[in-house]
């Protein structure tokens, strides 16, 4: 569904005052005849050098080197290799029911792999070079290239202060209803490196000598990286950590690294790279959208290192904090919408006499990710949520007990469900949508209320039990037990019509309705932001006059140590002094969510503080005629940043004031101050995005007009 304010969107460029971050130096591009050289300061005392061969028929990358500045010695990490992109192209369908104005590309329930599809490899139609930028970022475009129905250029970018080479096939197609996935890597006539290495799913380094004639093979790797080792160092290959993974129901490790000869039966030589798979990860595998004419950016990173593979992987992991969400003082990491089915599994184990009950892998996984609090969504496809009580109440008791057992001072497991009943009008051809509920303590309730059955009764075993039979009951329960509810996966999946369909209902306008949830879905690599579907909804809800928020959700089934969890995640950094213990209840988390005292992030960009006119997200401020309140934001990041925006609205339109951050180095910290135009606005929020399309955003601050 399109944003209702799409026609009133205005974007301006805003100047900002910045403090912090050192100048790492300058990237340069030089051309001499049929060669071009990109050099840049890669790290203290080291420079990177990429030599491009522009002759037809020759591999584009003549040499990838890292230089020791003091001695001038160069270590060659790869030579005579072609940066190659492979696409698998299929078609897009969006099954009903969907709103008539909703794009066919706004879909999750699709399987292009079940329809005709075909794989293609990229080829150069020429090697015309354009220098796009020098300075903090050196960038060139070379082309034209073709990859199946896509046409465009290859864009290569280096970042001063980073050992990275960022390669993107920037391509578009005119074909309608195109869905695709892509692989990327380096292909050479001769093997790349002497040995290959990666981290296996148990966290151990796996190393094997290069077998020059070995056929193409995919590997299940941890951290998404594969490394080619040579005598002078290592070259790591990895994708954008989140953008690369289109949404799936499961986070199974689908072998995203490959090596060998004849990749997909299309590569003429030996290669290494990253890859996606047509199927797997649940019942639906929707691939990536390519609306006609949009510039899709099919990206991959190469990291240069003078060290063996362990050093290259360690450096690559700095960009994701080691695939961990780092601690921030005064905040706790909260994640929501996990269908892990741990309750029914624990009940099965008990019934089979297994004692003591084992600790499921999910506890280890969440602690390893740095997560403090997990909001579960149990009984979604298992259990008996529709049972009137005899079966459901014991299942609820088991969920509460299991959450208590798995919680400790470092991890809080919060019981919850994706209930999907009563809240939302049922109209022919329209799904009222899915929603999640969270109470501040264990609450027993059934989703059925029989004739003459009281709304609330005292059960000798379970104590207070609520019976819900309609919208009024559900709303009453949420208010009485101080619970919160919100729209799951709004404007997509089974919530295609939500929350728009009930935006004027009392329950939506009430304080117990939190808002909606955000996830990077669907995938479209032409967009500079993830999850625009949800971000547009946040702006729409704010313009509706409903002071609602957008929290991050994951919405996945199953969880295991071997999974690629980090790539599919986002989290909420909630302002809390300490993590509540299970038996204390977790009312402080609900209070912080309701007040908007949190920011959402993929993990690489952290908004350590943000105020507008001295007010934090969720708070109100007054803006008078001619006032330009100061926005002050403290940021830290890993990948170099691309831009930030102050997004605001006046009840009719959405306005964006952009701050260019292309001068930022990697691994930086900065305080931004600026004064956007907010006169006549009713709300404003802040968001920021990096070159890998990782990002973070605050909740709105509410503006009261002062005449």
What are these regions (language model features)?
Residues 1-9:
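Bacterial N-terminal signal peptides that target proteins for export
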Residues 10-20, 397:
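Hydrophobic h-region of N-terminal signal peptides that target proteins for export
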Residues 29-32, 40-45, 53-292:
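Beta-strand/loop-rich accessory regions of lumenal/periplasmic or secreted enzymes
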Residues 232-236, 244-356, 360, 365, ...:
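Conserved structural scaffold segments of CAZyme catalytic domains across common CAZy folds
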Residues 328-482, 487-488, 495-497, 521, ...:
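A metal-dependent hydrolase metal-coordination microenvironment
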Residues 391, 422-441, 493-514, 558-576:
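Substrate-binding cleft/loops of secretory-pathway carbohydrate-active enzymes
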Residues 455-565, 637-655, 674-682:
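Domain-core and long-helix interface of multi-subunit machines
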